[in-house]
């Protein structure tokens, strides 16, 4: 028999053999291919690979049908039968007994843990091939004691389609990689479990529990219907919280003022060392048994998001003088909670968080309390004054989680709240010149009660007749009452469009006209129900000649120069700087007189660089400073100084030769 031909034929048969799937799940392990020496050992009967019954049957079928290699088959079969028995292995069979299977070919093996190598396949030399005979001869071998359970067939052994598992210790890199994979798997499982629990809780919370009424009387059906309606109404209730100023509980109206701006929140002007009453109302679910109310004062930049700023501790600090003279505790707190039925605990930490917390009784839906501020905006540093101050309330559960909140967008602690509030309102509305009285109202026909003590005159000709004005009083009473009647000659603008200089000076060259006005002495700050006293007087529209008008302009120009010099000396200007304003002067000089140099950028944005530009701008816009956007607290100074400047310039233009 030709051995080379026989080997080649056997190789062809082995390559054409179908691969029988193994019973084990094998990962990508490192495998080694058998070389030519292993084939020679198999043919010579010196080496018998482990084969499954199916592989043996298929191999026997092909070998018996192939002429010339019966000797090879007999050699393999004889070697398989004479294989030494491994007595120390388990007697458990990995496959059930099949019909027609030879009992002497059944082998029992045990499964052992395998170390899987995830690396790429490595090619090994012929000398590194595994010799199973050497392993079987050494019974004390560790590899033999921990037998490899494998149902690898002959074709899988020779063709390299089945990876071989080896028992060895993991390297440090492999162990770290395996530990990392286990941690990632645990984290993924934990996240999946949390998502499932969250979805399950949402499903139970959103589930509508409906009552199915049983067959009963009409009264019981009504009870079930009422229960269903009650549960549906409870679910429709929305959770809300409001934080408002209780003006009715104020001791004085001048202590504070607040303005609710549409789409811009609440603005509050409050006086220092005065009680400001507040009320907080809310509606939350009944599942929260223990609630906490927190009041926090925050100082934040106008460019920041207020929703984020109120949740971050502010760096607001009370000034040193007020902190040293403070009697309440803690001394460094900017405000305190007084006149409240709840117990408030301050939380003033190292981060200067201005916060007070109250533990509420179960079932509480509103809280009344007063706040007293012990420092004001003018005490702060320049960097702190540029920020905005707001007051926020938070409703929290027993775990400190926020449920609802509300905020007063801007809080201003000032000396005169009503004055600053009016300036704020004037900035939003149409501004009027300060020299025009807002209380003077012209009436063409005055109808007064004749039975009244102060009855109006029946005609303009009888305005000076005091005997008709006070008919039912004595002589002394008439004299005393007549002293209260004032005849005022004021310049009132006509209905026609006036020129710009005339509107500034408050006069118009028209004919003399006589009319009456009635001025009410109303005290807006008083809550008295007394009837306001009316005063009747004379009102005139004056017509001036050219000479009189020149004197009039010169008088106001001189007065304007004196007022401008006062502004200059008040702001400590050097002698080199002139105490007057000229059209060629830069706008910075005008702002230095007012004391608001930081507003120069607003003027430059509108193209105003000199006083001449500002004069032309006023001829287009009456409310120029509101359009520019200056500080409302300094609005009166702006208009007053510009009025004096324009009167001086009008005198210069009027006296120039035509």
Curated annotation (Swiss-Prot):
Domain of life, per lineage: Eukaryota
Keyword Metal-binding: yes
Upregulating conditions: By DNA damage.
Cofactor note: Binds 1 zinc ion per subunit.
Gene Ontology CC annotation, any one: nucleolus
DNA-binding region per UniProt: 238-428
Low complexity composition bias: residue spans: 466-476
Region Required for tertiary structure stability of the protein: start-end pairs: 535-564
Compartments, as annotated in UniProt: Nucleus
UniProt modification remark: Phosphorylated in response to IR-induced DNA damage which is thought to be mediated by akt-1.
GO MF annotations, alphabetized: DNA-binding transcription factor activity; protein homodimerization activity; sequence-specific DNA binding; zinc ion binding
Annotated stretches, region: Disordered: 450-477
Cofactor(s) needed by this chain: Zn(2+)
InterPro entries in UniProt: CEP-1_C, p53-like_TF_DNA-bd_sf, p53/RUNT-type_TF_DNA-bd_sf, Trans_fact_CEP1_DNA-bd
Chain residues that bind Zn(2+): 319, 322, 375, 379
Chief location category: nucleus
Keyword Metal-binding recorded: yes
GO biological process: determination of adult lifespan; intrinsic apoptotic signaling pathway in response to DNA damage by p53 class mediator; meiotic chromosome segregation; positive regulation of transcription by RNA polymerase II; regulation of DNA-templated transcription; response to hypoxia; response to oxidative stress; response to starvation
Keyword annotations from UniProtKB, A to Z: Activator, Apoptosis, DNA-binding, Metal-binding, Nucleus, Transcription, Transcription regulation, Tumor suppressor, Zinc
SUPFAM superfamilies documented for this protein: p53-like transcription factors (SSF49417)
Described purpose of this protein according to its UniProt entry: Transcriptional activator that binds the same DNA consensus sequence as p53. Has a role in normal development to ensure proper meiotic chromosome segregation. Promotes apoptosis under conditions of cellular and genotoxic stress in response to DNA damage, hypoxia, or starvation. However, not required for DNA repair in response to UV-C or to regulate cell-cycle progression. Regulates germline apoptosis in response to DNA damage. Required for induction of ced-13 in response to DNA damage. Its pro-apoptotic activity is inhibited when bound to ape-1 in vitro.
Assembly mode: Homodimer. Interacts (via C-terminus domain) with prmt-5; not methylated by prmt-5. Interacts with cbp-1 (via HAT domain); cep-1 transcriptional activity may be inhibited by interaction with methylated cbp-1. Component of a complex that contains prmt-5 and cbp-1. Interacts with ape-1; the interaction inhibits pro-apoptotic activity of cep-1.
Family membership noted in the UniProt record: Belongs to the p53 family.
Protein name from the UniProt record: Transcription factor cep-1
Lineage: Eukaryota, Metazoa, Ecdysozoa, Nematoda, Chromadorea
Gene from which the chain derives: cep-1
């Amino acid at each position: 028999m030709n051995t080379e031909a026989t080997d080649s034929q056997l190789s062809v048969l082995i390559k054409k053999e179908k691969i029988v799937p193994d019973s084990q799940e094998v990962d990508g392990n490192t495998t080694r291919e058998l070389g030519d020496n292993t084939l020679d050992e198999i043919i010579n009967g010196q080496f018998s690979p482990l084969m499954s019954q199916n592989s043996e049957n298929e191999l026997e079928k092909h070998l018996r049908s192939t002429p010339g290699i019966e000797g090879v088959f007999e050699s393999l079969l004889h070697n398989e039968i004479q294989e030494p028995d491994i007595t120390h292995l388990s007697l458990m069979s990995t496959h059930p007994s099949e019909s027609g299977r030879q009992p002497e070919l059944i082998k029992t093996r045990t499964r052992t843990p395998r170390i899987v190598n995830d690396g790429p396949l490595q090619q090994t030399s012929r000398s590194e091939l595994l010799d199973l005979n050497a392993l079987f001869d050494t019974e004390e071998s560790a590899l033999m004691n921990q037998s490899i359970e494998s149902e690898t067939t002959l074709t899988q052994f020779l063709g390299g389609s089945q990876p071989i598992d080896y028992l060895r210790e993991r390297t440090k890199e492999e162990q770290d990689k395996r530990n990392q994979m286990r941690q990632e798997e645990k984290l993924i499982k934990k996240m999946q479990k949390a998502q499932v629990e969250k979805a399950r809780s949402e499903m139970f919370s959103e589930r509508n529990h409906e009552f199915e009424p049983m067959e009963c009387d009409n009264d019981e059906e009504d009870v079930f219907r009422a229960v269903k309606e009650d549960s549906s109404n409870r679910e429709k209730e929305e959770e809300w919280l409001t934080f408002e100023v209780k003006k009715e509980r104020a001791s004085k109206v001048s202590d504070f003022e607040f303005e609710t701006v549409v789409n811009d929140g609440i603005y509050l002007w409050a006086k220092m060392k005065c009680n400001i009453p507040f009320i907080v109302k809310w509606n939350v679910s009944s599942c929260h048994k223990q609630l906490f109310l927190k009041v926090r004062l925050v100082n934040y930049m106008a460019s920041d998001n207020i929703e984020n700023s109120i949740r971050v501790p502010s760096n607001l600090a009370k000034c040193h003088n007020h902190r040293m003279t403070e009697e309440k505790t803690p001394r460094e707190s900017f405000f305190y909670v007084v006149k409240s039925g709840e117990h408030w605990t301050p939380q003033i930490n190292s981060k200067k968080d201005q916060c007070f917390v109250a533990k509420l009784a179960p079932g509480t839906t509103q809280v009344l309390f007063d706040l007293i501020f012990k420092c004001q905006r003018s005490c702060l540093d320049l960097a702190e004054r540029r920020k905005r101050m707001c007051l926020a309330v938070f409703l929290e559960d027993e775990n400190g989680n926020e449920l609802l909140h509300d905020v007063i967008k801007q809080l201003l602690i000032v000396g005169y709240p009503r004055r600053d509030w009016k300036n704020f309102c004037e900035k939003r509305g149409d501004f009027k010149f300060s020299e025009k009285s807002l209380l003077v109202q012209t009436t063409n026909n005055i109808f007064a009660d004749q039975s009244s003590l102060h009855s109006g005159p029946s005609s303009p000709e009888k305005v000076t007749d005091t005997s008709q004005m006070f008919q039912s009083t004595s002589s002394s009473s008439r004299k005393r009452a007549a002293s209260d009647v004032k005849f005022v000659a004021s310049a009132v603008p006509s209905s026609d469009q006036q020129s710009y200089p005339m509107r500034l000076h408050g006069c118009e060259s028209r004919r003399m006209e006589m009319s009456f006005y009635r001025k009410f002495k109303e005290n807006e700050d008083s809550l008295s129900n007394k009837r306001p006293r009316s005063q009747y007087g004379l009102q005139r529209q004056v017509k001036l000649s050219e000479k009189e008008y020149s004197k009039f302009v010169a008088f106001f120009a001189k007065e304007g120069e004196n007022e401008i010099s006062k502004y200059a000396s008040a702001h400590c200007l050097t002698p080199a700087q002139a105490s007057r304003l000229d059209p060629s002067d830069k706008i910075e000089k005008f702002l230095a007189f007012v004391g608001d140099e930081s507003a120069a950028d607003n003027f430059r944005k509108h193209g105003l660089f000199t006083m001449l530009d500002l004069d032309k701008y006023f001829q287009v816009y009456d409310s120029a400073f509101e359009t520019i956007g200056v500080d409302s607290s300094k609005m009166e100074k702006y208009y007053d100084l510009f009025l004096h400047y324009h009167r001086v310039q009008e005198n210069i233009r009027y006296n120039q030769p035509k």
